Amino acid sequence: MEQSEDTIQHERKNTFLSRVFGVHSSEVGDSIETAELSQYPIQIARSGSNAIDESRVIESDQASSSEEEDTDGHDLSVAENMTSYNGAQGSGSEDSDVPFSDQELETIETYTIAKVGQGSSSEDDRLQADSAEEEDALLFQHRLQDGSKGRNKVSSQPLGLKRILGSKGKSILGKEPASQEDSFIFRKGPTWDEENQLRPESKRPGLLSGKSNARLSSPSRPSPLSARERALWKWANVENLDGFLQDVYSYYLGNGFYCIMIEKILNLLTLLFIVFISTYMSHCIDYSKLPNGHKFSDVRVDQCYETQITGTTKLLFWIFGVFVVLKVVQMYFDFRRIHEIHNFYTYLLNISDKELQTIPWQSVIHQIMRLKDQNAVTANVVEVKAKNHIDAHDVANRIMRKENYLIALYNKDILHLSLPIPLYRTSTLTKTLEWNIHLCIIGFAFNEAGFLKQSFLNPAQREFLSEELKKRFILAGFLNIILAPFLVVYFVLLYFFRYFNEYKTSPGSLSTRQYTPIAEWKFREYNELYHLFKKRMGLSYEVANTYINQFPNALGDYFFKFVKFISGSFVAILALMTVLDPENFLNFELTADRTVLFYMTVLGTIWAVCHSAVNDNCSVFDPEDSLKELITYIHYAPKEWDGRYHTDEVKQEFCKLYNLRVILLLRELASLIMTPFILWFSLPNSAESIVDFFREVTVYGDGLGYVCKYAMFDENCKKGLRTNKHLQGTQTKYGHSLGDDHDSSDEETDKGMNKMIQSYMYFVDDYQNSVNAVGKYQIPKTQNLSHESKYNMKSHQHYSWKKQFKLGSKPEDFKIGSVTPRALSSSILANKPKSNLRARLDPEISHSNVQFDDLGESFINSIPVADYDPIERSDAMGGNGVLGLLNQYYRKSDVGR
């Protein structure tokens, strides 16, 4: 009997599905990595007993000790339940074969859901000994492992779901009714079509098409997998769902296979160009021959590599060459990985590279959820349960697992980023320092699989982890000291080549502003993907400039006007002298080695910068409304600003977050030298607070593992947007109550809860509102306002002499521009009370200031200028004659005088 079972096991491995997708047996489970928390919840309908409780494996770098017992229990239950479906063939014989005709086989193939596993590499050696008849007979057999006896049982249960399983197929496949919210964002069942009927139907994933994905081939020679089959196999055998979804999102951001690869190649060529041109200009040109030379060959040094470049420079060249070779090797592996994602998009999601530039991310999530529904039964890997939890919220949590911790880390202000020196007392975060923080903290707290290490959840490990973190800071400081000279040279040349032409053609761009790195981390919401955040920031620039330009700077204007006059006068004198002697005067040296052309260029640049710095435009002074409108874009309003929106102090605080680009560039260059000292003297003082931070903000999510608690959007958010002053009774697995945070005050708890609720509100708007389902380069369309609301808004915001000089009113008290057109943006938040939430977050805002919030003060869009034409046309139609002409004249000419 044992020999018969061994024969069956030997023949089972030679079936067609085992050649194409690998074997499906309990042996696969022995090689499962337990770093990812997920087991598929198989619910068994057994008479007289309840369904088996699903086991929860910790998603981290440590495995569960009860993993094998749970697996054996599931397999035994499945074996007992599968016996009842044998029907007329249910003799229970282990060695019985089920004959199928070609027509039946074709019918079964149509309704078969691919169940894929991963076999051993030695199976291909035995494929030529099998016959086609044995493959057809064994194609639908499964081996079920008995956990008590360790014997292999073979059931003749076929996989033709419609034909054999019937109504009990759901119990075997584990498809139970969803118990969570029935929505696209948090749902566990296919409910997208009911919620988005107005959206054009997207193409279904190319998984269960008319013809089978598996093509029968000659038994003597196995055929290679097609691109579609390989993509399906990769999807069914994903071992790290976090990394896979991050690759899927990076592919979406990169606009497809060719764009990503070309960008990588061009980045490498940019590095090679900077190194080559800097070396050539410094070693291979004789600058002493420039005044007398007339050709490039006159100043070029022949064989400069042998004669001019020293041994140290040559050694650095060889090191750089090794680095380039390693980058090329890395690019090769990136090519293979990106090509697999390309096949996943093309064959399983039915999304081409050309569509990625315009298709919304919500549609990609939609296709992934459809793919999960169609391929519910997958390989016996640890990601089965995780795939069953795929929705928009879980996908965002997996993609931003580390970023959510960083958002909370920077918002809690527990990092010491300043030095005790006069010019560097303020906390300044630069890109260089940000990269070092990510390397030292995130690289230490998370394992290679991307999950939080469980040692951070153990309070007993606090001292050990803090000491290790301090050592990492000190080591990173030494590495930055060693690399500082090369980084300084590289970034100086990079910024020079990148911004020189921009400043040369438009010197006024020196006064442009952009958000600082710390501002971006404070403005970003939890689970807000990068393309949504960058789009929101891009829409806020114009509003931010309008707010800052409302504050006059008389002292600065006087200074810039004087410098502008002096520099312009010298340029005019030199230009006049050039007209008198155009041939020789341009090369005339005013100082040593400085010609007239040089001074005209420098003075002309100074004049252009001063001219752009002087603000001669007259605008309506209403900084309070402008800042409130800006807050709807940046989602940042500290309590210290309450009641002071119109003051210059708030404007100065905002300018620290929205600084001049030139200042930011200088800070980046200075940080290359200052970062090692911050890593040595400042950040080690925050090591204990950082370890406590990870322990206090970490919660367990079913199917997700340990994530940041603010990114989970707990039930307090989903049930009415209620704000709590304490996180009550939420226990983590390590026995720490989230409400017992003795290190943080109630104000900090309220601040964190407010940001979490705000993040939840905008997350729902991004994914639930069909208006926001646009590509990463597009802006949502605004909904048209009704004629009555437009007329009411027009009557409140447009000037009329009748309003100003009506009886019983004071003309000097009439305020123009109390409601700006930008504040009347159309509503895209139809499903949630945004104004009520903002009133809760900022209770000092009066009702008069938010009376137009219910009209739809959108955070992502405002009404274009063209949308105001119907208002003006309706005005003209309603007011003909002399009074109508006066009304039109005053509205277009006198507003703002």
Swiss-Prot record:
The keyword Secreted does not apply. Forms a homotrimer with a solvated central pore, which is connected laterally to the cytosol through the cavity within each protomer. Acts as a lipid scramblase that uses its central pore to function: the central pore opens laterally to accommodate lipid headgroups, thereby enabling lipid flipping and redistribution of lipids added to the outer leaflet of ATG9-containing vesicles, thereby enabling growth into autophagosomes. It is a multi-pass membrane protein. It comes from Eremothecium gossypii (strain ATCC 10895 / CBS 109.51 / FGSC 9923 / NRRL Y-1056). It holds the Pfam family ATG9. Residues 1-256, 336-431, 453-472, 580-661, 683-897 are cytoplasmic. Residues 432-452, 662-682 dip into the membrane without crossing it. One of its GO terms (cellular component) is Golgi membrane. Homotrimer; forms a homotrimer with a central pore that forms a path between the two membrane leaflets. InterPro entries: Autophagy-rel_prot_9. Residues 278-314, 494-558 are lumenal. It catalyses: a 1,2-diacyl-sn-glycero-3-phosphocholine(in) = a 1,2-diacyl-sn-glycero-3-phosphocholine(out); a 1,2-diacyl-sn-glycero-3-phospho-L-serine(in) = a 1,2-diacyl-sn-glycero-3-phospho-L-serine(out); a 1,2-diacyl-sn-glycero-3-phosphoethanolamine(in) = a 1,2-diacyl-sn-glycero-3-phosphoethanolamine(out); a 1,2-diacyl-sn-glycero-3-phospho-(1D-myo-inositol-3-phosphate)(in) = a 1,2-diacyl-sn-glycero-3-phospho-(1D-myo-inositol-3-phosphate)(out). It is found in: Preautophagosomal structure membrane; Cytoplasmic vesicle membrane; Golgi apparatus membrane; Endoplasmic reticulum membrane. The chain crosses the membrane at residues 257-277, 315-335, 473-493, 559-579. One of its GO terms (molecular function) is phospholipid scramblase activity. Residues 46-106, 112-131, 195-224 are annotated as: Disordered. Phosphorylated by ATG1. ATG1 phosphorylation is required for preautophagosome elongation. Belongs to the ATG9 family. One of its GO terms (biological process) is protein localization to phagophore assembly site. Residues 214-224 have a biased composition (Low complexity). Phospholipid scramblase involved in autophagy and cytoplasm to vacuole transport (Cvt) vesicle formation. Cycles between the preautophagosomal structure/phagophore assembly site (PAS) and the cytoplasmic vesicle pool and supplies membrane for the growing autophagosome. Lipid scramblase activity plays a key role in preautophagosomal structure/phagophore assembly by distributing the phospholipids that arrive through ATG2 from the cytoplasmic to the luminal leaflet of the bilayer, thereby driving autophagosomal membrane expansion. Required for mitophagy. Keywords: Autophagy, Cytoplasmic vesicle, Endoplasmic reticulum, Golgi apparatus, Lipid transport, Membrane, Phosphoprotein, Transmembrane, Transmembrane helix, Transport. Residues 80-93 have a biased composition (Polar residues). This is Autophagy-related protein 9.
